Amino acid sequence: MEEENAVEILQRYRRDRRKLLDFMLAGSLIKKVIMPPGAVTLDDVDLDQVSVDYVINCAKKGGMLELAEAIRDYHDHIGLPYMNSVGTADEFFLATIPESSGSPPKRAPPPIPVLISSSSPMVTNPEWCESPSAPPLMRSESFDSPKAQELTVDDIDDFEDDDDLDEVGNFRISRRTANDAADLVPRLPSFATGITDDDLRETAFEILLACAGASGGLIVPSKEKKKEKSRSRLIKKLGRKSESVSQSQSSSGLVSLLEMMRGQMEISEAMDIRTRQGLLNALAGKVGKRMDSLLVPLELLCCVSRTEFSDKKAYLRWQKRQLNMLAEGLINNPVVGFGESGRKATDLKSLLLRIEESESLPSSAGEVQRAECLKSLREVAISLAERPARGDLTGEVCHWADGYHLNVRLYEKLLLCVFDILNDGKLTEEVEEILELLKSTWRVLGITETIHYTCYAWVLFRQYVITSERGLLRHAIQQLKKIPLKEQRGPQERLHLKTLKCRVDNEEISFLESFLSPIRSWADKQLGDYHLHFAEGSLVMEDTVTVAMITWRLLLEESDRAMHSNSSDREQIESYVLSSIKNTFTRMSLAIDRSDRNNEHHLALLAEETKKLMKKDSTIFMPILSQRHPQAIAFSASLIHKLYGNKLKPFLDGAEHLTEDAVSVFPAADSLEQYLLELMTSVCGEDTSGPYFKKLIPYEVESLSGTLVLRWINSQLGRILSWVERAYKQEHWDPISPQQRYGSSIVEVFRIVEETVDQFFALKVPMRSIELSALFRGIDNAFQVYTNHVMEKLASKDDLVPPVPVLTRYKKETAIKVFVKKELFDSKHLDERRSINIDVPATAMLCVQLNTLHYAVSQLSKLEDSMWLRWIAKKPREKIVIRKSMVEKSKSFNQKESFEGSRKDINAALDRICEFTGTKIIFCDLREPFIENLYKPNVSQSRLEGLIEALDTELGQLCSVIMEPLRDRIVTSLLQASLDGLLRVLLDGGASRVFHPSESKLLEEDVEVLKEFFISGGDGLPRGVVENQVARVRLVVKLHGYETRELIDDLRSRSSLEMQQGGKGKLGADTQTLVRVLCHRNDSEASQFLKKQYKIPRSHG
């Protein structure tokens, strides 16, 4: 709010000031007003720079008012602070700025220091700082040093301008290390006269003064002003501040602006004064003539004497520059063609040479020749310079500096004033005022808006390259955006720009191409290796891309090929990506080849570094480039894929085994490819039929790696099988320990299998599901082989069962061996012991085998789960494939692999060994008490209860060795064998066993005893299982309880077909069972029936 009030007060002050001046100048208070040089009316004078006090004093005196002196008086007093004239001694000037000095010290001021001779030591009293009675300091006394050591204005005046400028230049260099901008030069031909940048700079300043003089701002500074300016520059260099300097810098007046620009352009004050005085002298007597319409070099040659130079060498150098400028502006680079004026151009060249030759003549003759030549030169030069161009009126503009390309080179030097002399990376605070002032030179230099924006953008951009200040780059972009396209330009400007052409290296180049093509080339060079030049991907890269795109469009439109070009921003971005990726990849590859790789293959390191490169590219650079090319990431990824693929292919072609190099390179290459594909799909989607995917040649690392892994698996599986053979041959079927009641061979087999599995998953190479499936099948086969070895020497349980006795009917005589009906009984009878030599293992050995196989099947399940978990961890996600055929190949492994084959074989082996063990115990170990002597001579004298103790002994031996999970399984087999033995006794007990219906009750009791033995009060087998098994014996026991007549009637009621098919009768038994029951009856009715019906022979009497 206070700032707004201050602005309003300032505006009101300026309005009131102008009204006061208008009143005094328009009225009769001033007798005569003398205009400053270059001004015709008061409208040409900036009243804000006229001293009101000077005008009031002239009005009081009643004298003439010289506005030039009023302007000088205004600038001479502007640096002094305001004070009212009350005459009090308490008024003083502040030597510092209060706002920047901070708060006043809270301590008491120190006492007045005592000046002592240098030979005596200085004694200080520390109590002075705390003494309240210390006298206050006088305002004129200093804390720093005696007055004899201070610099006075006269001392400052002794500094030469050139020395000051050198010091300032050195200070600038010390603050900033300039970048090399040697490549960034406009594509313009050199000048025929050999004029230098210094010549252009000095002439540009002369033009600026002439144009400023047209607005009445040209005055010659006084001696006092010179001293004040020198003092201000020294204070700046010393880093000190003063109120007067601050106010001078904030001045927006034309005079101070020109003074500031003089320093910016490194023009000495002596030259400035010479030029100002010369221009003022040239304009004297030319009533109504504007200073900017003068032919400046000619007028200065005429009005500036050699006596104004410190030495003749400086004068000759100055004169040579003026003559060269006339030659360049009127002959070499004229804005208007000569036509019929060609002779005048020749005369002009001759006169210029004669003026230069006059300096070598004696003084009198030289002066005469120079004066004559200057007179003739004026006639010829003025006639050439005032030829009309672009429809202007004769005399309106003096065409001597607006010829291309001289004009743009001069304007470029003027534009350099916008940079701060002490910080060339910043624009000066007066940049807007400078640009506004430079517009006054447009008429003289023939500058249009398009030329201005182009040159200004060039100057800003080149300064950015030198200083690396991003702010300058942003300003340059703003100016580039202001350059109008062809259709946005007016017809006159379009026609004018079309004529601005020059030849460089036998190539015709337009104005825009001269300035924009170097910018474009520089931007292309930077972006063509953006990984190197924009290491951190700063915002500068985004601005550089903007510069490249703007200049590319402008140059494309300027070129004749613009109408036929189909190039776009996308193609430009792709060219940058292509170049930068190639350069970076090449550097990276060379660096890896030259580095110490610690025995790691260079392709593996290259893949890792390439992945890092792509991560940096996608996160830092691509967000910038994607603004103009949405699929730039896909292009970059496809390019990197190709570059690395070219390096990888020879290695893949030569890979035949899983060597250390292969194990190092394969995963790195596959990981890189998958990362690149993920980046591409993130931009292009899941559809892999896009243009960038089509160009990809897949590495197929996984396929090659899988093939090599399969070879390794096959070799390992052969090793496992040989180890299985070896382990089995060394197996003695002794328990390892009471806790580990299985054979040592299975432990060895699992050890080698697990080692192989560990090695498989330790292979850090890409794999497919096919390789895992092959490993599963190989291990499955190994355990099937092991199981077959266990079972190969185990006999059939039927070999343990003794031959079934011949069926005979009851009679007290020797049984005769006969054949029964063919349709009922087999013709082959075994009445002798089988001759097969059977190796019957011990029960403990069979139990160890059972435990071993159970351990195998249980560990297989754990191994299976472990392998799948490790596989899932190894392959956490579905891979992206480039070709659909690869997807189809992978579909062959859909279901989850397992050890189903070996598991099935082991379970079958467990069942067989259990059955064998039960049969062995009943029919071998308990054969005599069970099979041969049970129920002999009758049921009551040999009951089953007598066998329970022997069964319990066998059962205890089983349970002491067998593992807990197998207990019920083996006991169930023993129950089945016991029931088989009991049926054998009841149905095939031989001629010595007879059963009466009255004994069925005893038999039922025996069956119940056997059942309860295996149930064991709940500690044995489940009751339901035992009941189901005992059911078949109960039926036979029940048949033994029927009367003979009932059995015979049931047999007679059946047809022959039913008998052949084994159908059951009303008693629930088949024919064979009923016949066998009748064979064990000791009554004549059964014997007669069996003799008549089945021809069964009689037994021994």
Curated annotation (Swiss-Prot):
> According to its UniProt record, where is this protein located?
Cytoplasm; Cell membrane
Keywords attached to this Swiss-Prot or TrEMBL record, sorted alphabetically, are:
Cell membrane, Cytoplasm, Membrane
Q: What membrane topology was assigned to this protein in its record?
A: Peripheral membrane protein
The keyword Cytoplasm appears for this protein: yes
Q: In which tissues is it expressed?
A: Expressed in roots, cotyledons, leaves, stems and flowers. Expressed in guard cells and mesophyll cells of leaves.
User: Which InterPro entries is this protein grouped with?
Assistant: Munc13_1, Munc13_dom-2, unc-13_homologue
Q: Which GO terms describe its biological process?
A: protein localization to plasma membrane; stomatal movement
**Residue spans crossing the bilayer:** none
- Residue limits of the MHD1 domain? 663-804
The chain positions of domain MHD2 read 941-1051
Q: A cellular component term (GO) from this record? A: cytoplasm
Q: Which Gene3D superfamilies match?
A: 1.10.357.50
Q: What is its main location?
A: cytoplasm
Q: Briefly explain the null phenotype.
A: Retarded growth due to impaired stomatal movement.
Q: What's the family?
A: Belongs to the unc-13 family.
* Function comment: Controls the tethering of the proton ATPase AHA1 to the plasma membrane. Is essential for stomatal opening in response to low concentration of carbon dioxide and light.
This chain's protein is named Protein unc-13 homolog
Native source organism of the sequence: Arabidopsis thaliana
This chain is encoded by the gene named: PATROL1
